């Protein structure tokens, strides 16, 4: 796991030094501490080393770091036919260009990935150090660590144990990741204007909205999104124009002063791009529980939808069925699955657990989860009651329906409020990009 990632970082640094590569930007090689655990009393207890690095040790990196490249299990082969690159959504266009047209990407070593490296990126998650940098406005990439699902898979049998030893090491995968991400670092370094595509942000905002649940707030949201999309596209065209001009200057063997002037324009635009990216993280990006990265209103939207299904099932008198549409088949999904704890543990245990998840009960101890959560639906009394009635076969669910209905209405109010906040934020971001 982590030892190979550190080895890869050091190998990349050595390769650049030994080759005489002269970067246009500062390139820092970092090994973070506390990647697996670094805090107590919080559900956001991992990647705290990275959080401390970007927030306290070097907060000046935020706003001028064009990319962070991270590694997880970079020498493990799980049988994939095609290698993949994971990144924030706004880097998906750059990834496609890098793979398809940059000319820098080498073929996988010994055809370890017989279908090569995919041009289609995969969105990142919260399970590694990149999430701490992203929260501070630093966009990032990471290799795709293999998992091998199922009880006999590598994750289940070896991950985070002494069985993650030398016989799990693949030199071909390690060298392929070194080649791929080393070339990506050079590609980023050599490109004057950072191709961080905010059209992807617009796509996520569009996909996130359930217009039916949003009701009368849907149209203002969509109108603001249309304006933002136009601004994002204009910004992307400005990025492309600078990079095209730079490439033309290189092809024409322009003098150094000309190249430096184009690069300076690129740096100025990069500052604007990174400001916009950080704004996106602060205003739009939420986290459900500690795992799902979503547009903020989705947490409430999901709750409204799930609770509606629970109420409908109770009105039919169905707690559980083979189709999975009974009230108890659905209720565990409330609050991003946090309700599931009540199926096995006491209310006291669940209260202690949830206190480590929420800002108001655990201030200053959420790290990369700060300002990313939502107000949870207080449906657990009804859920606990249903679990008890499932044992007694009591079929009167009037009181439980009332609890769920009340909390659904409250979640609807939070949903409306968050959609309106996001609408205002889209308008502000449009102005930022147009300035």
Model-predicted regions and their roles:
Residues 1-435:
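Secretory-pathway/membrane protein signature
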